[in-house]
Each structure stands twice: as C-alpha cells, then as structure tokens.
C-alpha cells in the first residue's frame, strides 16, 4: 500500500501546549511541571503520525505520555492531533530521542518505552544510525523503573532479530515476551498507521516486550 502524504499544519496554529523543543523541557527534570500533574510516565520514541500516542493517552487517562519525534513536520502533525483530540496528558518533543534520554530523562522514571516501526536503515553501512543501537538500549534500560516495560515492533525481520540479540547482549532486561496480534475491527484499532499499512498489505509484524526486573543487576 502506498504511503499517504502527511498533512502540513498551518504555521500560524499555536501548538505550544502539546509541542516542545528539548530545551523547553524542565531542567532539572520535573514531569509534574511539564504535564501539570504527577502520573506514571510512558515514552514513545518516533511518534510518526501520532496514532499510538493519541489512542494510548485516551485509553489511559491516568498516565502521562511523552512522544519524541525527530521530524518537524511529523512532530507538528502529532501535536495538532493531540490538541484536537483533547489529549492533555500527552506532549510531543521535536528532537533526537537518544539525546532526550541521555540529557533530560532521569534514571528509573519511565513506566514504559514504546518503539514502533523505527527506520530500519537498510544499508549495512547505515545501520549505526538505527535508533535501537547498543547505547540507546542501555539508556532505555536505565530510565525504566523496576517493573517497567519496553515494547518494540517492526516489519523488518533482520532488524527484529538483531535488536533482540543486542538486548540480550547489552542489557539485563527480561524477555522477549510474546505479544499476540490483536484483531482490528476498524482502521483506528491498529497501534500505528504503519502497522495498519503493513497488515493490510499482508505483511508480517514482529513484536516483542521486555521487562525490567524489580531488582535489576548492576552493570
């Protein structure tokens, strides 16, 4: 299925309530200041068109959701969607997720990290650009609270198997745990737009969930 072009958001629309730059985030980190309340915090790396973060924020109103999207056009699209759907418990950061994890999010503050259909960077020479590289996986592990979870989905088998190998080699996260495919009754029942396009095209989606132990090993 062909990818539909993303809508350009009017530059005059005020998105400031749902769209931040990394330098606009509280320092030192204070999620209660950012969201106006204290609540369990979930992070999505690469929010794309915003289907997951918008649906999750609506489904779990007692959680806060922070999405990090490096593409300016996509970040603005996500923020506009969150505002239109009144998702006051979700905010998009336009920036590099690795840098946000490293410089802004403290250790053991996230209840979940979601990474759905990241860019596979097909050429072998470009794979070092993948978001789920060893140093980022270690950052994710350190930022998860004990009992926190990592959710990773992709339609690229090589990316899936190599990432699972890296997780086993570079982290102490428990898993992978199987994630069963949920039947979709309508087009909004998919996790992301990419999942919808992949499944409707008859292609396989690879899914895994990992959990941080209550007493994770040091190092």
Which residues are covered by each model-predicted region?
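SAM cofactor-binding core of SAM-dependent methyltransferases
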Residues: 40-99
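Conserved beta-strand signature within the Rossmann-like core of class I S-adenosyl-L-methionine
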Residues: 146-154
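Class I S-adenosyl-L-methionine
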Residues: 162-165, 169-219
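Class I S-adenosylmethionine-dependent transferase superfamily signal
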Residues: 113, 140-141, 150, 163
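A short glycine-rich, Lys/Arg-flanked "PGG" loop and its adjoining helix->strand segment in the class I
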Residues: 132-146
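S-adenosyl-L-methionine
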Residues: 1-43, 51-58
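A short acidic, Gly/Pro-enriched loop at the edge of an enzyme's catalytic core
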Residues: 103-112
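Conserved class I S-adenosyl-L-methionine
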Residues: 126, 154-169
